[in-house]
């Protein structure tokens, strides 16, 4: 595989941004091995954004001959009060349900779970000892309190929101994870951009400059026209601060279960959630149902998109997402017909994950998490 092919794999959807493409090319031309990581907070059930979108990108990295790592951030989750703020529970879920869910998701999208390294944060810190603390101090000495405060959006917190002092540690800890793992390719959703920019800015203290790759954040099913217009205005005026604050409200979130598709949802759950989802007729930008076709269904199935009109029983076939968008923008497709297609294809794609967690070996991990959520 040549350099151009590797770059194309890294840059293709769901990638939205590479910081920077020139540095990526330089590293590849120099024959530098790329060491990747993506970090995850440990909370509730894994949805399409966490499982499928993230793992689609990990799959691409694997194809591009990048060493991939999934980092289970138990201390970060504790700081951010996930799973009731119980560290023991967080670790149990991390090593059980969460690790399994990510591996199953990677396999579902065509990646190789046997070729990905899974690292628990606390185990890394125990191994590194004082070195990890030194990394945090180095980072803190090379950035400002104002930058750290602005970076709290990586935790799903809005700027100006009241936070604990521990939560201020979150950003330098995340940056320290990158250097502590010897990562030169940091990966995350576009909401993680601020931490990765700080990592690049403090790179002189560590002797090398990492690349950052940011993937698309999947919209939640609950977006409405008011939120949509706010986001469109932020994009139009290139107001990154407003956009990043708004993304917290509209991205698919496990804390709002009716707005998220989980990887082990039943067919009935998927159909119900898709049926209720926001899908404005003729609008293709910031439309969560269109996004599911563009970022989940088409990249995985790689097959023509066939939409059936339920009234006339006539079908329309599209070779790619752009053709579908064009027809939808012209109001040639009814939202209900598009929703029907999306629901059935998601049911098909998620069948392996659903069987693993509802009927197979993964059921014990799913039930364990359910019980922990009830008793905590």
From Swiss-Prot:
Q: Which gene encodes it?
A: tyrS
List, alphabetically, the Gene3D superfamilies matched. HUPs (3.40.50.620)
**InterPro entries in UniProt:** aa-tRNA-synth_Ic, Rossmann-like_a/b/a_fold, Tyr-tRNA-ligase_4, Tyr-tRNA-ligase_arc/euk-type, Tyr-tRNA_synthase
Pfam families in UniProt: tRNA-synt_1b
Annotated function: Catalyzes the attachment of tyrosine to tRNA(Tyr) in a two-step reaction: tyrosine is first activated by ATP to form Tyr-AMP and then transferred to the acceptor end of tRNA(Tyr).
Q: Which GO terms describe its molecular function?
A: ATP binding; tyrosine-tRNA ligase activity
**Organism in which the protein naturally occurs:** Nanoarchaeum equitans (strain Kin4-M)
Protein name stated in the entry: Tyrosine--tRNA ligase
What SUPFAM superfamilies does UniProt report for this protein, alphabetically? Nucleotidylyl transferase
Motif ('KMSKS' region) positions are: 251-255
Quaternary structure annotation from Swiss-Prot or TrEMBL: Homodimer.
UniProtKB keywords: Aminoacyl-tRNA synthetase, ATP-binding, Cytoplasm, Ligase, Nucleotide-binding, Protein biosynthesis
Q: What is its EC number?
A: 6.1.1.1
Reactions mediated catalytically: tRNA(Tyr) + L-tyrosine + ATP = L-tyrosyl-tRNA(Tyr) + AMP + diphosphate + H(+)
The family assignment reads: Belongs to the class-I aminoacyl-tRNA synthetase family. TyrS type 4 subfamily.
Its chief place of residence is cytoplasm
For this entry, list what GO says about its biological process.
tyrosyl-tRNA aminoacylation
Which positions does UniProt annotate for ATP binding? Answer: 254
GO CC terms, sorted: cytoplasm
Per UniProt, L-tyrosine binds at 37, 170, 174, 177, 192
């Amino acid at each position: 595989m040549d350099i151009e092919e590797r770059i194309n794999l890294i840059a293709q959807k769901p990638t939205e941004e590479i910081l920077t493409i020139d540095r990526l090319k330089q590293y590849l031309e120099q024959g530098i091995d790329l060491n990747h990581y993506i970090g995850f907070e440990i909370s509730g059930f894994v949805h399409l954004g966490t499982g499928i979108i993230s793992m689609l990108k990990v799959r691409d990295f694997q194809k591009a001959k990048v060493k991939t790592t999934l980092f289970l951030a138990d201390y970060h989750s504790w700081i951010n009060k996930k799973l009731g703020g119980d560290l023991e529970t967080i670790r149990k879920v991390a090593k059980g349900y969460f690790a399994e869910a990510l591996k199953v998701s990677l396999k579902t999208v065509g990646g190789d779970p046997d070729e990905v390294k899974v690292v628990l944060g606390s185990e890394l810190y125990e191994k590194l000892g004082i070195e990890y603390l030194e990394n945090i101090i180095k980072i803190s000495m090379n950035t400002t309190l104002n930058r750290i405060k602005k970076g709290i959006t990586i935790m799903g917190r809005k700027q100006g929101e009241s936070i604990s002092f521990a939560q201020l540690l979150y950003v330098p800890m995340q940056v320290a994870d990158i250097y502590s793992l010897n990562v030169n390719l940091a990966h995350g959703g576009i909401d993680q951009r601020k931490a990765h920019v700080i990592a690049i800015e403090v790179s002189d203290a560590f002797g090398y400059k990492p690349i950052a790759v940011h993937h698309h954040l999947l919209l939640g099913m609950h977006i409405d026209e008011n939120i949509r217009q706010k986001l469109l205005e932020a994009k139009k005026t290139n107001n990154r601060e407003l956009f990043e604050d708004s993304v917290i409200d509209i991205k698919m979130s496990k804390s709002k279960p009716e707005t998220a598709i989980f990887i082990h949802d039943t067919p009935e759950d998927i159909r119900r959630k898709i049926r209720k989802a926001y899908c404005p007729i003729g609008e293709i930008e910031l439309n969560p149902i269109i996004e599911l076709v563009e970022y989940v269904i088409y990249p995985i199935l790689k097959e023509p998109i066939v939409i059936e009109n339920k009234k006339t029983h006539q079908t329309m076939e599209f070779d790619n997402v752009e053709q579908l968008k064009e027809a939808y923008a012209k109001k040639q497709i009814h939202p209900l017909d598009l929703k029907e297609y999306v629901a059935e294809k998601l049911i098909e794609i998620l069948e392996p994950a659903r069987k693993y967690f509802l009927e197979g070996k993964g059921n014990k991990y799913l039930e364990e998490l359910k019980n922990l959520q009830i008793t905590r």
